[in-house]
Amino acid sequence: MQILLANPRGFCAGVDRAISIVERALEIYGAPIYVRHEVVHNRYVVDSLRERGAVFIEEITEVPDGSILIFSAHGVSQAVRAEAKARDLTMLFDATCPLVTKVHMEVARASRRGTEAILIGHAGHPEVEGTMGQYSNPKGGMYLVESPDDVWKLQVKDESNLCFMTQTTLSVDDTSDVIDALRKRFPSIIGPRKDDICYATTNRQEAVRNLAGDADVVLVVGSKNSSNSNRLAELAQRVGKPAYLIDSAADIQEAWLKDAHNIGVTAGASAPDVLVQDVISRLKALGGVNVQEVSGREENIVFEVPKELRVDIKQVD
């Protein structure tokens, strides 16, 4: 049984930055450090940070006065940001992915101009809630669509003054279908200058598509609440291969591997490599004899942490 590893896989620059912000805050200021929402959607990462003193909350009211608060990588609405700034907090750090912030700026610009904005995204996802919450102009409008059907049912105030943007972790193929529907339904609609689906999402989906061609089964390391991890499993299934989303090696069922000669392995953008290595070890124990890295796009993007956290940890008492 051969093990095929997708490239790229695992952590993206935004996730790396968000985790580093929490880790450095803990090292510099000490526990507890409060984080609004899971900093990234991965159970292993969240549990590890919680053990070190991170406290994950959903409401700003849960944060005691004088505390340090961090916004998660998914971003927050203007209302949440204002609520946090009104509190008596020692420090407030923003771990929002810069590529999510880019979409926030697009929405805020539309709001200032009174242009109605349509967001393609999944209802209830924290990134979507934060992005929708950048729009405040009552003369315009902000709408959420998930499918072409939603587009055809949508009613807006002025079809000649519309723009759209997307959640950063969507399926490239599904989003293309929704954008096609938007352009047919609203011919004058204006899209972003550069695709809102982030480089990491696109690259990992492309890697899974390449991997699935040679794999009999695909294992995606990622948590159930991770949007980009779910999209990877769906993509492998769409090209006709059995695919399973797993939090860890312990989730692997031997029955999945029956009669399989090539096992494809990838990881969502919020899944650490240690989990992938555990999966490889588990597969070797089940008969895997060779590990092959499948070539893919190289990634060298790095996002810096806030300047207050750019200190030599060794110098911290």
From Swiss-Prot:
Q: Identify the metabolic or biological route this protein is part of.
A: Isoprenoid biosynthesis; dimethylallyl diphosphate biosynthesis; dimethylallyl diphosphate from (2E)-4-hydroxy-3-methylbutenyl diphosphate: step 1/1; Isoprenoid biosynthesis; isopentenyl diphosphate biosynthesis via DXP pathway; isopentenyl diphosphate from 1-deoxy-D-xylulose 5-phosphate: step 6/6
List the molecular function annotations (GO) for this entry. 4 iron, 4 sulfur cluster binding; 4-hydroxy-3-methylbut-2-enyl diphosphate reductase activity; metal ion binding
Tell me which residues bind dimethylallyl diphosphate.
Answer: 41, 74, 125, 226-228, 270
| InterPro entries the record matches | LytB/IspH
Q: Which reaction does it catalyse?
A: isopentenyl diphosphate + 2 oxidized [2Fe-2S]-[ferredoxin] + H2O = (2E)-4-hydroxy-3-methylbut-2-enyl diphosphate + 2 reduced [2Fe-2S]-[ferredoxin] + 2 H(+); dimethylallyl diphosphate + 2 oxidized [2Fe-2S]-[ferredoxin] + H2O = (2E)-4-hydroxy-3-methylbut-2-enyl diphosphate + 2 reduced [2Fe-2S]-[ferredoxin] + 2 H(+)
Query: Which Enzyme Commission number(s) are on file for it?
Result: 1.17.7.4
- One Pfam entry for this protein is LYTB
For biological process, the GO terms are: dimethylallyl diphosphate biosynthetic process; isopentenyl diphosphate biosynthetic process, methylerythritol 4-phosphate pathway; terpenoid biosynthetic process
Residues annotated as binding [4Fe-4S] cluster are 12, 97, 198
Binding locations of (2E)-4-hydroxy-3-methylbut-2-enyl diphosphate: 41, 74, 125, 168, 226-228, 270
UniProt keyword terms in alphabetical order: 4Fe-4S, Iron, Iron-sulfur, Isoprene biosynthesis, Metal-binding, Oxidoreductase
Q: How is the cofactor bound?
A: Binds 1 [4Fe-4S] cluster per subunit.
Active-site residues are 127
The record's function comment reads: Catalyzes the conversion of 1-hydroxy-2-methyl-2-(E)-butenyl 4-diphosphate (HMBPP) into a mixture of isopentenyl diphosphate (IPP) and dimethylallyl diphosphate (DMAPP). Acts in the terminal step of the DOXP/MEP pathway for isoprenoid precursor biosynthesis.
Indicate the quaternary assembly: Homodimer.
* Family to which the UniProt record says this protein belongs: Belongs to the IspH family.
Database matches in HAMAP family? IspH
Q: What protein is this chain from?
A: 4-hydroxy-3-methylbut-2-enyl diphosphate reductase
In which organism is this protein found?
Answer: Serratia proteamaculans (strain 568)
